[in-house]
Amino acid sequence: MFAQLDTKTVYSFMDSLIDLNHYFERAKQFGYHTIGIMDKDNLYGAYHFIKGCQKNGLQPVLGLEIEILYQERQVLLNLIAQNTQGYHQLLKISTAKMSGKLHMDYFCQHLEGIAVIIPSKGWSDTLVVPFDYYMGVDQYTDLSHMDSKRQLIPLRTVRYFAQDDMETLHMLHAIRDNLSLAETPVVESDQELADCQQLTAFYQTHCPQALQNLEDLVSGIYYDFDTNLKLPHFNRDKSAKQELQDLTEAGLKEKGLWKEPYQSRLLHELVIISDMGFDDYFLIVWDLLRFGRSKGYYMGMGRGSAAGSLVAYALNITGIDPVQHDLLFERFLNKERYSMPDIDIDLPDIYRSEFLRYVRNRYGSDHSAQIVTFSTFGQAIRDVFKRFGVPEYELTNLTKKIGFKDSLATVYEKSISFRQVINSRTEFQKAFAIAKRIEGNPRQTSIHAAGIVMSDDALTNHIPLKSGDDMMITQYDAHAVEANGLLKMDFLGLRNLTFVQKMQEKVAKDYGCQIDITAIDLEDPQTLALFAKGDTKGIFQFEQNGAINLLKRIKPQRFEEIVATTSLNRPGASDYTTNFIKRREGQEKIDLIDPVIAPILEPTYGIMLYQEQVMQIAQVYAGFTLGKADLLRRAMSKKNLQEMQKMEEDFIASAKHLGRAEETARGLFKRMEKFAGYGFNRSHAFAYSALAFQLAYFKAHYPAVFYDIMMNYSSSDYITDALESDFQVAQVTINSIPYTDKIEASKIYMGLKNIKGLPRDFAYWIIEQRPFNSVEDFLTRTPEKYQKKVFLEPLIKIGLFDCFEPNRKKILDNLDGLLVFVNELGSLFSDSSFSWVDTKDYSVTEKYSLEQEIVGVGMSKHPLIDIAEKSTQTFTPISQLVKESEAVVLIQIDSIRIIRTKTSGQQMAFLSVNDTKKKLDVTLFPQEYAIYKDQLKEGEFYYLKGRIKERDHRLQMVCQQVQMAISQKYWLLVENHQFDSQISEILGAFPGTTPVVIHYQKNKETIALTKIQVHVTENLKEKLRPFVLKTVFR
């Protein structure tokens, strides 16, 4: 029977449409018993192909297509692994090929268990190679020209499932080669997956011996994977068990903890670790963290269930004492649940590449590798539509309608406007069909963000590799790597560890004190107060609005309640926040069910927040071992009904044996079952809450250091938060501006790095060359390559030359002339001076807006402050608003979102506003929005009057009145009240947004008109002339 060998899969990137799952399905439909894959150079899909075939009752044949240089010509070869030995040879051959190291001598040394096929299209009678091979033939091969001494074998290339896939493959080739469809060569026909019986009949008729050769070749093919654990040995000269014991005992003694119950707990853990064969694993993790600390890196407090291990604490793998804080080792590791211990290594993100180099050098480049991932066609629609000639602006408009997680089919179903665009043109419908066909297919390789694989022997004995920058990269994904018994470790580059380290260094530099951040008091009052206020912008795990609002509700009074907040800030658990608060305040009864489990539930007021509580209850109440309790916890969290039913009966029987009432036991089990579904890992919550507390400690005690580091090392915006904490943005000059942001004496000095598009080299040049004496001096000394308006204008607009010429508009308007002057005249006539042309400067508001546009924040005095200082109207700062009160706020509008109500279809608006210190959400219902909509504009300043409400634990305003707030007013000087009615009538005829103030000279009375605002024009001035002494607009 025919077997399909030469199938290119989607892992031959953009050269096939054969994905493995559909391949298995179609192969069975077409009557195949044996199928193969033969991707070019790589084995990316090999493991999943073999396992998928076995699962689907198909015989897998693993192949590989390569080209190899021999006698100055490239020879095309198709290789077949005939057995497990051949499989391992393919691993090595593919690795050599994907590393650019494959040559004929190496190839010939790895041919045991390999069948070599040379396709007829690549053969010539002059070809002589140093190995035996089959001749591959297809339906179009002219057999009369073949070498009669060679064994023939059917070899038909497949790249797609059906003929109508050809157009899609043509599109993939166009995308791959970055060509238009017209420029892309047409796809070869007759490369679809054909019916097995038809091909069998063809070869039986035309080339029966080739078919027999094929059957003989594949008949005995079978592959066996070695899935046994292959942990590296840490030290071959010493027992890992003894070394681990020595190190952990020394670690506890150094911490002053060589006493009970630590000694017995340590022995208990060491026995389990040794019995499970993980001594080397702990030593390797210890070694890696030791390397980081030896370099001065802050390695954090640990993460995950590993924080429950005393061995990990003794080795300084974690920074949490699990005995003191009642954390469970069995949640991490136990003999009743055999699985690899999972200690993820957190490290400062800026040093991850150094760790990779250390692993490579310490454990060997053949024994360690990064793990591959595959980038897929997520934005397939952009790639495809582009090849159909759709303009970029249309593409952008179309892709905006696609959500991050939406499939094309989903967005087509959900979005009417998207559907209308697709159906508007025939070519759009065609392109959309193609985009759906390739969506989700792998496009290229990438690297796992954290994963590293390590092995005791050469990795290529187990998996294929490819070359990488810092170290080799696996061809198998993480699942296949672990399935082959290899140790996968996650090296997680955490930006927050970088923050802590840089803050420690800056405190030492600026304040002359060394802070051991791991030894700070986790009950520090100032830091707890910061959490209680929800002042946690920039604090790991607590900077999102949900967490901030939760903190404001809970108002943690001790560190344990911060840990609880982490756990409550999750779906399901958050439903118990009100109960938690009321019980803590004594406003709700705490049901502890049974005195024997009261100590377990009391810290969380009777609420099972943590997975460990479920385990401890099973241990104390029903006599389960902690290992068995962990199996119960897992069954509950995974909702394994069959296992839970069995466990429930076991729980009841064990509880009854200990004298518990059956009804109470059943009720307790149901309660445990309910909470286990969303209970959080307490060890992980504790470790990460400790890291959060460390960051918050700096924010509470060294705010200038905190904001300095956050602004320079984070991509997020912390300026607003700093301003809310009473920091101010300082005005800088060309002679004082730093490169990075700097904070001194509560002043924020924005750096040159914030100026979008400014070359780094130019910024460095400015710092190195200053001081400058004038605008002309700066331009004269500026290198010609930087004498471009695109580089110079931002410097002018943010006021860096105000120290020489405060009129920024004047410098900008004269810039062309200045550049001519310094280049042509300045060098010839050093005593000459530039003739400036005068012009009106930008307004305060315009200057501020330009600064915001260029560096993201205003550096001048905020226009609102100027308005507030001159305001004759009473208003309340946003920070002092009280719920259920009427208030007026003076604000700037950041954004306006308009919607239609579901009931009436009328428009209403949601505003996001700020008063330079705080932000506020404002709602205008249809009636108010209809009145004021023409006045509202983003970036403008207003007095808003309304009712203060609380929603989702945040204050917001329901707006009733809107009034423009501008610092300029229209002043009228009049003799007395004689012409009040005439003046009022004239002012009413010129409605606008400028407030009017009248000063009566006779009695020295000044009145700000509250009901009249005007549009100032020359016509208004002329109309008022007979009735006033003077008008001033300022």
Curated annotation (Swiss-Prot):
CDD domains per the UniProt record, alphabetical: DnaE_OBF, PHP_PolIIIA
Spell out the subcellular localization from the entry.
Answer: Cytoplasm
A Pfam match is: tRNA_anti-codon
As its record notes, the protein acts as a catalyst of: DNA(n) + a 2'-deoxyribonucleoside 5'-triphosphate = DNA(n+1) + diphosphate
- Gene Ontology BP, a term: DNA replication
A GO molecular-function annotation: 3'-5' exonuclease activity
- Provide the alphabetized UniProt keywords: Cytoplasm, DNA replication, DNA-directed DNA polymerase, Nucleotidyltransferase, Transferase
Summarize the protein's role.
Answer: DNA polymerase III is a complex, multichain enzyme responsible for most of the replicative synthesis in bacteria. This DNA polymerase also exhibits 3' to 5' exonuclease activity. The alpha chain is the DNA polymerase.
Q: What's the protein called, per UniProt? A: DNA polymerase III subunit alpha
